[in-house]
Amino acid sequence: MSDPQTHAGLIVPSVFYGLSEGSPAFAAVQALADQENVGHPLGPWFISDNLITFGHTRGFLADQHFVAAVLAARPTQAERSIAWRTHTLCWAAHSVASLPGDFVECGSYRGFSAEVLMHFTSGLPHRRFWLYDLFDPTGGPGEGSRLPDHSPALADQVRARFRAWDNVTVTQGKVPEVLAQAAPDRIAFLHIDMNNAEAEKGALEVLFERVSPGGLIIFDDYGWTGYRAQKEMADTFMQAHGLSILELPTGQGLVVKR
C-alpha cells in the first residue's frame, strides 16, 4: 500500500478479526469500510483492528515522527492495521524517557512493535531492549497460539532484524523460565503480549518488582473478549498490589507502577 505525501500521514487498512464472512456484522463493517477516505489519516473515520470511530482526529496518523518509525519497520497490512496500538507503545516509550530501567517485551513474534520503538526512540540510547518469545510454539501448556510466521527459523530472522542495534537482546524460550537466563534488574517499559494467562502471570511474578516507580506496563490482549483469562489474571495481580488497569479502546491495558 502506498502512502500519501509526508504531510498527510499513514494510511490504515480496514482489518477485523472474528467476523464470519457473510454475517450481518461483517456486511455492516464492510459497508462502513467502503466509504470514501476510510483509512486516510486526514479523514474522519478509523475502521480497523476491531475498532470503529468517527470524528476523532487520530493525530498520531499524521505525526511524521511516528509515521516514519512505522514505515521504517516495513509493516505488513496486518501491522498497519494495529497503528493505534503501536502508537500507544510509542507514547509509553516517550513517557518513561526520564525513568531508570530497560525495555522488555514478552511475546515479540516477528519483532515489528519492537523495531518501531527502536526507530521512534532513535535507537533507545543508554538502554537495552530485551525481547522474549518461543518463536516456534508447539501449543503446550503456558504457550500462546501458533501464528502464521511461527517457525524454527523465526528466532534467527528476528535477530537479523535487529542486527543494526547492539543494545537489543533476543532470547528464545518459554516465559517465565527463560527469564532466569537473562533479564534486566530495572525496567522502565514492560510490554506483555503472549496470548496466554499462565505465561503472562509468570512474567509479572518475575518482572513486576523490577519495574521502576512511574514505569509503564502494557498488556496487549487485556480488553479482548477472546482473552478474558488474561484480563482476570492481570486484574487480580494488580489489585493485590493496590493498582488498577486502564482498559483502552484498542483492547490494550495500561498500568502505571507506583
Task: Annotate the PLM regions.
Residues 1-84, 96-99:
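Rossmann-like AdoMet
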Residues 7, 51-80, 90, 97-258:
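S-adenosylmethionine/decaboxylated-SAM
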Residues 85-92:
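A short, well-structured juxtamembrane/interface segment
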